Amino acid sequence: MRHRIAVIGGGPAGLAFARVLHRHDCPVTVLERESGPDARPPGGTLDLHEGLGQLALDKAGVLAEFWALSRPEGQAMRILDTDGTVLRDWRPGPDDRANPEIDRGQLRDLLLGPVDVRWGEHVTKVVPGGRDGVRVHLADGREETFDLVVGADGARSRTRPALSAVTPHYTGVTAVETSLDDIDTRHPDLARLIGDGSVAVYGVNRALVAQRGSGGHVKVYAQFRAPLDRHTKRDTADAGAVRSRLLALFDGWAAPLLDLLRHGTEFVHRPLYALPVAHTWAHVPGVTLLGDAAHLMPPLGAGANLALLEGAELAESLAAGTGDPDDTVRVFEERMWTRAARWASFTTAGLERLVSPDPAAALALFDRVQPPG
């Protein structure tokens, strides 16, 4: 295979795609808007599932390195009620490797490896149908042409409009993210509360989730139902003001739970958006989508796993093919849509139960619902 291939986006989907192509000695151009791999904090931690994210890393040839970095103990999950009573306390067995955790930054570095990324390349538009191929427009006025453009450019994809007029909609839930560093030394009581993995608390139309990463770093997510303009447009630079609003929103919850917000350092508002559950498009030769660009869904552990596997699967199929790569892309899209629709349905229903008027619905979800395959 020697076609001109570009992937837009250096996240999990784009890097998995590029890494698998590199493994098969297939050239690919990676265009990433960020100025470099450390341009901004890489985020929290991910659990990579057997048959999804782990399978993708196996295809990329980095599964052994993943196991050296991952935290199987991070699968531990504790659920509390708002007065701090422990309702569920699940801990993985010594050989449980179903969904081990890894920091997003570690995963990024693992996939980057030998992949050559063109940093600081801001794609503004993708135009298929040209006589010479698909044209990629860049913010500085340049244009480049490729035989295949893979949009792995996330929720605000600049590639998606070439295939679909659909845009993500607000789910009705906003998350405010904050962080605690060196928690075992600075806040040992909170470290014990969180344990080795995550702790989640569900109230009426709101939830509080704390997730341990490596090096004593913890991400805390305050989630609540609110109109889109109620909190999301407020300036988060004044951490004290944001903290006060959150403490008022979660007033009446147990003091140790509120300490997760009191000791948070910086705050980021993240309104949760999603694409329609069964988002598809009429196939367009030379362009396709992966990950959030294709099927943005509520953040319940599926998105990154699907993105990784899609990137790896498409790259593997293209590397193995000897015919028209467009036929390969058609087959891939059908498979991706079917699998993504199952997970989008699951995560959409999950968000409705986890942040709902009935906190018991969240507990029931953990007790009864099994994720799709």
Which residues are covered by each model-predicted region?
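Accessory recognition modules or surfaces
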Residues: 1-6, 12-13, 33, 38-50
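C-terminal domain-closing interface element
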Residues: 350-373
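Short beta-strand micro-motifs enriched in acidic
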Residues: 128-131, 211-215
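Conserved protein kinase catalytic core
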Residues: 38-39, 159-160, 297-298
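Conserved mid-domain beta->alpha element of the FAD-binding
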Residues: 6-27, 31-34, 150-151, 176, ...
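Short helix-loop capping/hinge motifs at secondary-structure junctions, enriched
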Residues: 64, 182-194, 256
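FAD/FMN-dependent oxidoreductases across multiple families
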Residues: 196, 203-206, 212-218, 224-300
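Conserved N-terminal helical subregion
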Residues: 1-5, 20-22, 47-183, 229-232, ...
